Amino acid sequence: MAGIIDLASLAPTDTVLKLPHPYLTEYTVQRSDDKLFQLHPKEGSTVQPLPFALHAPHVRFSAPADLKSSELPASANNSLWARSRRSPFSDVRWESDAAAPTLAQAWLLLYVLFTVRPGMELVRLQLSGPGADVLSQQLREVLLGIAHPPPPPKSQAAAPEQATTETSSTVVVLRSTFWQGAGSPFGPRPVWCPDASPSSLPASTPLSQFPTTPLQHTITVASAGDPQDPDRYQQSLHPIRPAKPAPGAVIYSRWVPHLKETFSMVSVDYTDAEHLRLFHEWQNDPRVSQGWNETGTLEQHREYLRKIHEDPHQVALLAKWDDAYFAYFEIYWAKEDRLGGYYDAQDYDRGRHSLVGDVKFRGPHRVTAWWSSLMHYLFLDDPRTMWVVGEPKDTNAIPVMYDLIHGFGLEKFVDLPHKRSALVRCPRVRFFQLCPLGAQEKAVGGVNIGLVPKL
C-alpha cells in the first residue's frame, strides 16, 4: 500500500517523525527485541526545547499489524466491532516496575503509528503494563480513542477483546480525531497550528488562552468585483471574525514523511522586504499572471498586500518547504467574500486561492502535500468550519482534479463577473474520513475512480 513505512527497514539514524514548529525535534526508532521498537529523540535536532519529556524511553511498541485472514470477521459484517477487528493492532508495553506513559507520550506514539500507516482509519492499541487502564481511559476521555466494542450477539462465537484490567487494556484509536487535534500536548491549539496571536497580545497570553471568539454577527457591504459595473456592491450578514495572526507568524507547520521536509505557512508582512519581493516577482511572472492578472509595480503590490492586511475576512500567506519559500496563498471567510453571494454560504465556510511561485517546487508529489495541508489548516483553525470551498475556472481541469483527490465535490457552476467557475465544496466530515495528508493516488478521494494522468 502507498505510503506505508516499514519500521524494520529504517536505520537507527533515519528520522521517522519530526515535530512541527517551533520544536522541530526529530525521532528515530530502534529495535528493542525481535518485533518491538523504541522511540528516541535525535540528538541535536530540537530547535526550541520541549516543555516536558515527550518520549518514554521505557515503552516498547510493535509496528501496526493485521490479523490473519482466518481471524477476521466476515466481510458482510460491517459493525463497529467488525471494523475494529479488521483494523491493524499495535502492542504497547512497559515493564511491571515502570510508570505508564503519559497521555502526551502516548500521543507521540500515535503520531508515529499514523505516520508509518497513514491509511489506517482505526488502530487497536493493546496496552500492557501498570496503569494501562488509566491510560486507556485518558485516551478515551480526550477522544483520541473509544472502548473496543463488544461483538454483536450473532458474533458471540468470535473471541472478544481481553477485558480491561489494571495492567491490560485495548483501546480503538481514531485517525479522524487525531488529525483534528485530539490530545495535542502543547495547549489548546492542535499541534500543527502554533499560537498565532495578533501582535497586540503578549506571548504569555496568546489568543488561544481565551475562549473561542464568540458568535456576533455584523453586516458588510463590499464591492461585487464586477469590472463591467464597478459601482455594484453586495451585502452580507456574517460573524465578526477572529483576530488575524501577527504578520510574520508561523500559522501551520507539518513534517511531510514522503518528502522528508517540513511544510509551513507564514502570515505575510507587507512591510517585510523579502515578503514583498517574493510576491512582486511571482505576480510579474508570465506563468502566474495568466491566472492571477496582478502584474504591477512594487508599490502597487505593497498596496495590494496592505489592503488584505486590513481586511478582516482575508489572510495572505507565504508557504515554504523547510526554509525555502515557494508559494503564495490567500485564505478567506466565504460568507462575506464575493463567492458567498453565489451559494448558500454557512457562517464559517472558508476558501483559498493559491499560486506556486518557485517552479522547482512543482509536481504532484509536492502539490498533494501542500494542497491537503492548506485544507487541514482551514478546518483546524476554527472547529466551527464545516466546509472548505473553492471556485476554480470551469475550464481549468487541473485544480478541479486536485480538489477531487482531496475530498471536494463539484456542487454546481457559478457565473462570477469575470469567469464561470466550478463551485467545489469539501465537508469537514469527508476530509477527516479521508485524512489525505500522505502521498495521494491520482483518484477521486476515497474511491478507486482514476483521474487522467496529466497532473
Curated annotation (Swiss-Prot):
| Pathway the protein takes part in | Siderophore biosynthesis
Q: What is its main location?
A: other
| Entry similarity comment | Belongs to the lysine N-acyltransferase mbtK family.
Q: What is this protein called?
A: N(5)-hydroxyornithine:cis-anhydromevalonyl coenzyme A-N(5)-transacylase SIDF
Q: Where in the cell is it found?
A: Peroxisome
Instruction: Look up keyword Zinc and say if it applies.
Output: no
The keyword Electron transport is annotated on this UniProt entry = no
Q: Where is this motif: PTS1-type peroxisomal targeting signal?
A: 453-455
The record's EC number reads: 2.3.1.-
Q: Which GO terms describe its biological process?
A: siderophore biosynthetic process
Function description: Hydroxyornithine transacylase; part of the gene cluster that mediates the biosynthesis of at least 11 siderophores, including beauverichelin A, dimerumic acid (DA), Na-dimethyl coprogen (NADC), eleutherazine B, ferricrocin (FC), fusarinine A, fusarinine C (FsC), metachelin A, mevalonolactone, rhodotorulic acid (RA) and tenellin. This cocktail of siderophores for iron metabolism is essential for virulence, and more specifically for the fungal virulence in penetrating through the host cuticle. Siderophore synthesis is also involved in conidial germination under iron-deficient conditions.
What cellular-component terms does GO give this entry?
A: peroxisome
Any transmembrane segments, and where? none
Keyword annotations for this protein, in alphabetical order, are:
Acyltransferase, Peroxisome, Transferase, Virulence
Q: What gene is this protein a product of?
A: SIDF
Q: Which organism is it from?
A: Beauveria bassiana (strain ARSEF 2860)
**SUPFAM superfamilies annotated for this entry?**
Acyl-CoA N-acyltransferases (Nat)
